[in-house]
Amino acid sequence: MSVGVAVLGSGNIGTDLMIKVLRLSDSLRMVAMAGIDPDSDGLARARRLGVTTTAEGVAGLVALPEFADVALVFDATSAGAHRHHDAVLRAHGRTVVDLTPAAVGPYVVPPVNLDEHLRETNVNMVTCGGQATVPIVAAVGRVTPVTYGEIVASIAAKSAGPGTRANIDEFTETTARAIEVVGGAELGKAIIVLNPADPPLLMRDTVYCLCPDTDADRSAIAAAIADMVRAVQEYVPGYCLKQDVQFDRVDSYLPALGRRLTGLQVSTFLEVSGAGHYLPTYAGNLDIMTSAALRTAERLIARRAVTA
């Protein structure tokens, strides 16, 4: 039996997520979409697909008769708006999957720590860069400690809508924190690049892990990364390594750490292409977010069904 869900936000991410629920999920049923722009393509598309809509935001959503059938809400708006949305939805007893960088609930990256948070009523999907790179930091950390993790996420400028651009500062802060909290690095840093190239390029991510053990088992690290890539590919088929993992000895002063580090640098180069459900395939940054959110919601619902 499927469980009713709603999407807050009728932009690129919200619309792609709606289509994923409709096309891919056996356990989730798309009930409603709420936005604030009555002329948005997302709301128009939802209406064409037979999904109930409102342009009155979260207030309009909870006022819909169909809201009674909604058990879980995806929030695909902005970090600032989410705090209000969470308060409203929490008061109505709804579970929330947050696709903004607000991080009201715990960070969740499905192949790394989803099992730890299945009882939560609000979970945060970090950022697109976080979903792509935190698994790699965590994979390295399963073999050897990571002192410093730095990621560079390069995304097509055309894939960055108003919501993404409004959240740029929160993107870097939230991703860096997730590198530490979920990835396990002592210190994390995140950089995002909006690539204006036309035709647009696929999402590329570079992950640097600095490890204090120069003699760490390189084969074991490479194998752990390969295993993690396969785990992500279960729900994001377009996620892949672009080349072999690189290893370099380092012995230098790191301003971010405020000290000298002698150890091993592990460099991982990733590419993410989207599934093309609603967004172009170059928007892998958005696709990995919606795919991770869908995977998370299905697991949350399954956990509740087992314990009901």
Curated annotation (Swiss-Prot):
Cysteines joined through disulfide linkages: none
Residues annotated for NAD(+) binding in this entry: S10, G11, N12, I13, S159, A160, G161, P162, G163, T164, R165, A166, N167, N285
Pfam family, any one: Semialdhyde_dh
Domain of life: Bacteria
Entry keywords, A to Z: Aromatic hydrocarbons catabolism, NAD, Oxidoreductase
GO BP: catabolic process
GO molecular function: acetaldehyde dehydrogenase (acetylating) activity; NAD binding
EC number annotated for this UniProt entry: 1.2.1.10
InterPro entries in alphabetical order: Acetaldehyde_dehydrogenase, Acetylaldehyde_DH_C, NAD(P)-bd_dom_sf, Semialdehyde_DH_NAD-bd
Keyword Oxidoreductase: yes
Catalytic-site annotation from UniProt: C128 (acyl-thioester intermediate)
SUPFAM superfamilies: Glyceraldehyde-3-phosphate dehydrogenase-like, C-terminal domain, NAD(P)-binding Rossmann-fold domains
Catalyses which reaction(s): acetaldehyde + NAD(+) + CoA = acetyl-CoA + NADH + H(+)
Principal EC category: oxidoreductase
Sequence similarity: Belongs to the acetaldehyde dehydrogenase family.
HAMAP family, A to Z: Ac_ald_DH_ac
Protein name: Acetaldehyde dehydrogenase
Organism: Salinispora tropica (strain ATCC BAA-916 / DSM 44818 / JCM 13857 / NBRC 105044 / CNB-440)
